[in-house]
Amino acid sequence: LETMTDIERREMFSFYYPGEALLGLALVANHFKSDKKLQVLVREQSRPALDWIVNERPKYYSDLFTALPSDAWLMQAIEEWANDPDFRNEDYINFVFNDAKEMIKRTYARDDSPYIDFEGGMYYDYGDHYYPDGARCEGLVAAYYLAKKLEKYDLADEFLKACRLAAKCQYQLYINEKVNYGHKNPAKSVNAIKFKATRQWVRVD
């Protein structure tokens, strides 16, 4: 990475994979108890990575961040790391809670959306077609677990309410016999999940 230009770094920028890697490392640190040496090494190496990704990355790549947060993997990673009291860093915790609150803020409500079936879906700019975003919902769930873990029960209730609303929105993507009549092979598509509300593409993930 040190030999790459800033343009090359930007082209390789991803919200997903660093958080996913840190979640994997957290699982190793917390659960692979048969290898104490590895656990110590993982903790030592992960702390500066978390510090950089939470506090420094936004300074270098602020223009790549969108209004609707995209870092659900990192939210899950921080929730898992919080099982270790030494990793209950205020900056990490605030990152999760602030991103979750921003997701909720950019979620259509029944009495505040262009169409009633947008309820529970997310948007970048108000008026967008809604995004029934399961990946971001994983970040919301992580925020709920983290709030419970830290005994912030009012906050946990707020996040759980948002999770339930988002889950109802996700159900609209479920393909059953009532909605697959136009498919070439309805028997094959039944019980699948659509990629988007307005597309009949099936998600294989």
Question: Where would I find each of the regions flagged by the language model?
Answer:
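Beta-propeller domains
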Residues: A49-P58, L64-M75, W81
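Residues at structural and domain junctions
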Residues: I7-E11, Q39, Y60-L64, M122, ...
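Aromatic- and histidine-enriched alpha-helix N-cap/loop-to-helix transition segments
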Residues: M12-L23, F65-Q76, G127-E138, R203-D205
